[in-house]
Amino acid sequence: MSDIEARVKKIIAEQLGVEESQVTNEKAFVADLGADSLDTVELVMALEDEFGIEIPDEDAEKITTVQNAIDYANTHQA
């Protein structure tokens, strides 16, 4: 597991109040991890803070799974 992947999974677990072991790459935030719309907004903000990036709304809407978040962080990190 890469450093970025580990950091993303830790943020997701903390933001959604789930065990890190539940945060696997294929999990969807809403369907699998119980996130609501506010959770997803807070999650995007936490990712922005952690990686020093700004995620436009149109991109944020596409980040719906753990793997989406990892890929986005890998591609856009500061």
From Swiss-Prot:
**Stretches of the chain forming a coiled coil according to its record:** none
Q: Which UniProt keywords apply?
A: Cytoplasm, Fatty acid biosynthesis, Fatty acid metabolism, Lipid biosynthesis, Lipid metabolism, Phosphopantetheine, Phosphoprotein
GO CC list: cytosol; membrane
Query: Which GO biological-process labels does this protein carry?
Result: lipid A biosynthetic process
User: Where O-(pantetheine 4'-phosphoryl)serine occurs along the chain?
Assistant: 37
Q: Which domain of life is it from?
A: Bacteria
Tell me the ranges covered by the Carrier domain, including all copies: 2-77
Where does the UniProt annotation locate this protein? Answer: Cytoplasm
Look up keyword Cytoplasm and say if it applies.
yes
Describe the function of this protein: Carrier of the growing fatty acid chain in fatty acid biosynthesis.
Q: What family classification does the UniProt entry report for this protein?
A: Belongs to the acyl carrier protein (ACP) family.
The molecule here is called Acyl carrier protein
